[in-house]
């Protein structure tokens, strides 16, 4: 029986899981990102965003906004809120671009 290759969407989900797991647990709970782990994630995986910020506290404010249950860490659901927000912002930016001739 042949194995079915994962779809593009399934590969994207696997990638998100792998990235989260790569950063979570370096300081303890491997199911959550600590503030330091989140900062490392942002500076590594979203470096173009963080390097273009004039306010160095922007990452801390993002963490606070994303931390829905106020436990000082981000679980996978809270992490996905960040990813979803970025995806929506990118999609919206594409919608406002003028059409190509």
From Swiss-Prot:
CDD domains, per the entry: S-100A11 (cd05023)
Top-level division of the source organism's lineage: Eukaryota
A Pfam entry, by short name: S_100
An example Gene Ontology molecular-function term: calcium-dependent protein binding
Domain EF-hand stretches: 13-48, 54-89
Listed transmembrane segments: none
Binding site for Ca(2+) 1: 30, 32, 37
Gene3D superfamilies noted in UniProt: EF-hand
InterPro entries xref list: EF-hand-dom_pair, EF_Hand_1_Ca_BS, EF_hand_dom, S100/CaBP7/8-like_CS, S100_Ca-bd_sub, S100A11
Keyword annotations of the record: Calcium, Disulfide bond, Metal-binding, Repeat
GO CC, alphabetical: cytoplasm
Tissue expression pattern: Smooth muscle and non-muscle tissues.
Quaternary organization: Homodimer; disulfide-linked.
Additional facts recorded: Binds two calcium ions per molecule with an affinity similar to that of the S100 proteins.
Name recorded for this polypeptide: Protein S100-A11
